[in-house]
């Protein structure tokens, strides 16, 4: 059974209709493109400044915060990407909430609400840490980052559990594929986050050459696996359309 809602609206009342795959690709391509632009631009044109460390040891990669938030035009490009993709991410969170209400067991629907809450808070925290940078607003940026990471890790775990064992129906092949990617991306994300934390502490304690480079590399993996996890919505809602009409609001439909 495809994850779709049995709602049929008057075609004349439909405000828009588009394939969910297109929505998912746009929602991912904005931050993904912005991230790669910021890193590549920093390495090409701001290498010395973006890779500088407080103890001036050898470093070859900018941290995520340095790449996206410290210099222009990277700061503006990243903020624009996050600003434009936020409504799409919130729309996807709303679609997931409706999906969980429709397709998971009634006794577990609080988990669906929790997943939606974590997803929304993660999105808002990402917005905050992008617009309040570490260079200009360190405490706000730090707190937003902590909230982002906590909600991100919890959301990935809850989302995986929701899709693994509390569905009402047997999973279809594309849903099983999504589940495998969720599991693998979550595990890589957690491992990379742990290694990034280790490298950060070691760098601050010993100031060894190259350690901050590994910290930045593991940061990149955390960012990319987070984006990849959210991209699994492509398979969760395979071959469906996102429809918005005046009566039902935003929902999924096969028609």
Swiss-Prot record:
Keyword Endoplasmic reticulum tagged: yes
Keyword Lipid metabolism listed: no
GO CC terms, sorted: endoplasmic reticulum membrane; Golgi membrane
Any one Gene Ontology BP term: GPI anchor biosynthetic process
Residue ranges of the TM segments: 23-43, 111-131, 143-163, 185-205, 209-229
Name of the protein in its database record: Post-GPI attachment to proteins factor 2
Function: Involved in the lipid remodeling steps of GPI-anchor maturation. Required for stable expression of GPI-anchored proteins at the cell surface.
A Pfam short name: Frag1
Topology of this chain in the membrane: Multi-pass membrane protein
Family of this protein: Belongs to the PGAP2 family.
Assigned keywords, A-Z: Endoplasmic reticulum, Golgi apparatus, GPI-anchor biosynthesis, Membrane, Transmembrane, Transmembrane helix
Coiled coil start-end: none
Domain of life (superkingdom): Eukaryota
